[in-house]
A protein has these predicted regions:
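Divalent metal-binding acidic/histidine catalytic loops
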Residues: 1-149
Length: 149
């Protein structure tokens, strides 16, 4: 920061106080017999009223513990809710591929497809997307399932 002021100093002190109070906090991951990666993805369509941009996010679990997550405002305005959902699923797919490779590197290869569940009112069926990414043979392991309501 080029010119820190009193507000920055107060914020820094608050962060340090928080860290001091929560130094003994942690996440508990229990031992699971089946290490199956599961993903969840969602996006709101034009959720920001100022610029009409969507926010999308995903999380990935092994057992009951979250191992990866993301939430971010999209850089462009999408024309439909289905476009926003598929862009979110594309990001989640990239993360799933990366996580599967990491799990394989540590000796925990995934034997089944990674399910990425998405709540989507405009599509009421399961899809396997082969054409979004340039490596369709990798995407054969990843199935998108949208919840039927």
């Amino acid at each position: 920061m080029a010119k820190p002021c009193e507000t920055h100093w107060k914020a820094t002190k608050q962060v340090l106080i928080y860290l001091k109070r929560t130094v003994n906090y942690g996440l508990l991951y229990t031992d699971v017999s089946d290490v199956q990666l599961a993903g969840y993805s969602d996006s709101d369509w034009s959720g920001n009223l100022d610029d009409r941009k969507s926010t999308s996010g995903y999380s990935f679990n092994i057992g009951s513990g979250v191992i990866s997550w993301s939430s971010k405002k999209q850089p462009t305005v999408y024309l439909s809710s289905i476009e926003a959902k598929y862009k979110a699923l594309t990001s989640a797919t990239c993360e799933a591929i990366w996580l599967r490779r990491i799990l394989e590197d540590v000796g925990t290869q995934q034997k089944q497809a990674t399910r990425i569940q998405c709540d989507n009112q405009s599509q009421l069926s399961c899809h396997t997307i082969q054409s979004i990414m340039p490596y369709p043979n990798i995407l054969s392991y990843i199935t998108f399932c949208e919840r039927k309501d």
